[in-house]
Regions:
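N-terminal presequence-like segments and adjacent domain-start helices
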Residues: 1-18
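Hydrophobic C-terminal alpha-helix "anchor/cap" residues
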Residues: 16, 20-21, 78
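Short, well-ordered secondary-structure micro-motifs
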Residues: 18, 64, 99-103
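Short edge beta-strands and adjacent turn/loop segments
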Residues: 23, 27-56, 88, 93-96
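Active-site acidic-Proline motif in GNAT/NAT acetyltransferases
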Residues: 59
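Short, non-transmembrane amphipathic alpha-helical segments
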Residues: 63-82
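Short, charged, intrinsically disordered terminal tails
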Residues: 79, 83-86, 94-103
Length: 103
């Protein structure tokens, strides 16, 4: 049988969000003014998938290392769950949580 299967951008955004939130130090996804699904934007240009995540992180985390871990986890998750290879996974840290009390 011939045909095509398509996975909606909303589903891909949910996968990316779930993967990002698995990383230690990621506190939440941050919604912005541009339309995106709970802090995640998926673009699909002729089958080329790009992911942009806007995150809030915990105080004191190593932001570059956390961002790299999110990129890896999201790319692996999309490959495993949707059989897609993202051309890019961009991580934007928009918020840092407050320092712990007494710090």
């Amino acid at each position: 049988m011939e045909g095509h299967s398509l996975i909606s951008s909303d589903i891909l955004a949910s996968y990316a969000a779930d993967a990002a939130l698995e990383i230690d130090g990621v506190a939440r996804l941050v919604e912005g003014t541009r339309p995106r699904h709970h802090g995640v934007r998926i673009t699909n240009a002729d089958g080329v998938i790009a992911v942009e995540l806007h995150l809030g992180v915990d105080w004191g985390v190593n932001i570059p290392a956390t961002g790299a871990a999110v990129q890896t986890r999201v790319a692996e998750y999309l490959e495993r769950m949707a059989d897609l290879t993202a051309s890019s996974v961009d991580v934007v840290v928009d918020d840092i949580g407050p320092p712990p009390e007494g710090a």
